């Protein structure tokens, strides 16, 4: 992204913003029309802004009346006020820069086209035809709505019960900051300083990677009530680590010998995440919301109660029928010390709650601002509405909304990945002799796994147990909303705070979650703000995913990357709007440096 435009003349001579853009590839056939439509709109906007900006120059000189240049977009009547002219220049220049970003391929795993019965596709809430099977007429009404985007078509989707789909039209919303969702896909995005693939296709149903992720989910379901600090001595955790170590497609962190250890289970692999306790310091250190004390103890759910482990209940939930079951509360508030606790937290949290709380904790423990903050060394000023506390807090909240609509586009209009509960149902059908009712088959690595056998021994069936009576939310799995919000929000916090700051006096929840005790591990002096921000992103997204059984590991990993890319895009846009001159560097999730500058 270029630096802020310093004059209207510079801005309005930027021509052909989109005409010369080179695409990085084609969308998958399934999604080509949707991607093409969104690309066409962005192209029209870019062309109009480039050509219309030149037209606008003449308008400014001759004071002609406003002119419509695209449906809903007008070149305004000129004004002599320099601030309005400057504001207009910044807005048009920013839109020009965004419209130049190429549109990458939007590549799915191919399962929707591969299986006629749609057993590998998200269909929850639609009228079902059997375990793992959707009513195909209902599915066609669903796809008609997604393909048309017509609000009336969404009202004609054939549902199986009273539960409604969770906001599919949010994915069609446009934003006024940052690049568009369609500009982030199965390619890197150098314009947003992200050089890894942003949103690769999810693992396909029959792949070893899919099977490995499902094995991990079965183990997580069996460890839901075990304190993270107890994993090191827990026999089930040891079995889980041993089995996952032997799976080449396991994507989680390993030790220096290539092994998964009990203390590495269900962790992310970004820098700093394997240092210190499982739970981020930002989730447990007491803080203040103004004058309100926050001790970070949470209401959680009673241990040992899981759901959707019989065919009748499973099928009710897939149809969107209320089973009448409800989560039972643990009467004792606890610190986040187990998978069930994280699941309960993320079941009820406000969209950006964890990251706003993290912002409060960073202030409580005295983390300095990012050294690139223009007020870091000022003798006469401090930041406030810009580069100060109100800016910090408001930007964390704002980016969450942008991130959610971005990921909703990918969920509903590209990938339609089904939920782990559906994968567990396929395992169950195959292992109970009903596999021929389905077109798809999962990999033998999950069918023959110790995890599935241990789950059957506990529950008496092969379904993947769920921490919530309703199972997953009624939106597709990939990517995950909690993950993209995590990636976006931690990027904002890295932009504003000094990520290299070492967190003093780290703590860890006790085994029962009733108290905090000092963390005395040998790596206690290596726990940094950057590492704990990376860690909280996985804590919260896995807390909403792997631990309760409603998301896959790859949902989170891709989502955090997507959120980071979007946040960098928004920060680059906002850099144009600040009066202060600055250059801010921060460390991305891959360990490399991003730079936001308007100098």
Language-model regions, residue ranges each:
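Hydrophobic alpha-helical bundle signature of multipass membrane enzymes
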Residues: 38, 64-553, 557-599
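Intrinsically disordered, low-complexity segments enriched in glycine/proline and serine/threonine
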Residues: 17-18, 26-29, 37, 47, ...
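N-terminal export signals
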Residues: 40-62
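N-terminal secretory signal peptides
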Residues: 1-36, 62
């Amino acid at each position: 992204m270029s630096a802020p435009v310093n004059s209207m003349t510079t801005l309005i001579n930027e021509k052909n913003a989109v005409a010369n853009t080179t695409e990085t590839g084609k969308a998958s056939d399934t999604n080509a029309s949707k991607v093409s439509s969104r690309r066409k709109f962005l192209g029209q906007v870019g062309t109009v802004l480039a050509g219309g900006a030149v037209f606008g120059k003449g308008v400014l000189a001759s004071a002609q009346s406003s002119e419509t240049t695209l449906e809903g977009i007008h070149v305004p009547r000129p004004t002599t006020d320099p601030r309005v002219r400057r504001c207009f220049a910044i807005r048009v220049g920013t839109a020009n820069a965004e419209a130049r970003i190429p549109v990458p391929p939007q590549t799915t795993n191919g399962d929707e086209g591969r299986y006629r019965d749609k057993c590998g596709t998200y269909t929850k809430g639609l009228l079902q035809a059997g375990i793992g099977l959707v009513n195909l007429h209902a599915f066609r009404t669903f796809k008609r709505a997604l393909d048309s985007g017509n609000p009336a078509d969404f009202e004609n989707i054939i549902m199986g019960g009273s539960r409604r789909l969770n906001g599919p039209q949010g994915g069609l919303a446009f934003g006024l900051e940052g690049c568009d969702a369609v500009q982030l896909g199965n390619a890197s995005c150098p314009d947003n300083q992200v050089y890894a693939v942003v949103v690769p296709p999810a693992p396909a149903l029959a792949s070893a990677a899919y099977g490995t992720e499902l094995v991990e989910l079965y183990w997580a379901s069996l460890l839901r009530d075990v304190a993270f600090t107890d994993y090191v001595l827990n026999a089930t955790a040891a079995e889980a680590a041993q089995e996952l170590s032997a799976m080449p497609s396991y994507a989680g962190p390993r030790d220096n010998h290539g092994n998964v250890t009990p203390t590495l289970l269900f962790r992310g692999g970004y820098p700093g995440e394997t240092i210190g306790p499982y739970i981020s310091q930002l989730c447990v250190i007491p803080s203040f919301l103004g004058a309100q004390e926050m001790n970070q103890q949470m209401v959680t759910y009673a241990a040992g109660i899981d759901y959707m482990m019989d065919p009748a209940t499973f099928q009710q939930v897939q149809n969107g029928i209320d089973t009448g079951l409800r989560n039972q509360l643990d009467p004792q508030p606890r610190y986040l010390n187990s998978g069930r606790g994280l699941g309960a937290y993320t079941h009820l949290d406000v969209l950006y709650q964890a990251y706003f709380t993290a912002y409060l904790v960073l202030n409580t423990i005295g983390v300095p601002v990012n050294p690139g903050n223009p007020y870091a060394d000022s003798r006469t000023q401090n930041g406030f509405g810009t580069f100060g506390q109100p800016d910090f807090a408001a930007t964390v909240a704002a980016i969450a909304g942008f991130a959610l609509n971005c990921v909703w586009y990918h969920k509903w209009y590209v990938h339609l990945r089904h939920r782990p509960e559906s994968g567990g149902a396929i395992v169950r059908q195959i292992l109970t002799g009903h596999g021929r009712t389905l077109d798809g088959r999962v990999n033998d690595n999950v069918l023959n796994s110790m995890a599935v056998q241990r789950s059957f021994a506990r529950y008496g069936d092969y379904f993947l147990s769920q921490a919530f009576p309703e199972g997953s939310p009624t939106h597709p799995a990939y990517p995950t909303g909690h993950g993209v919000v995590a990636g976006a929000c931690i990027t904002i916090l890295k932009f504003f705070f000094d990520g290299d700051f070492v967190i003093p006096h780290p703590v860890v929840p006790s085994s029962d979650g009733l108290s905090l005790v000092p963390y005395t591990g040998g790596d206690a002096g290596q726990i940094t703000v950057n590492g704990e921000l990376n860690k909280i992103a996985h804590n919260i997204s896995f807390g909403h995913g792997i631990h309760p059984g409603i998301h896959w590991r790859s949902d989170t990993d891709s989502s955090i990357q997507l959120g980071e890319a979007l946040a960098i895009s928004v920060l680059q846009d906002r850099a144009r709007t600040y009066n202060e001159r600055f250059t801010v560097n921060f460390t991305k999730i891959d360990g490399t440096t991003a730079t936001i500058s308007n100098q």
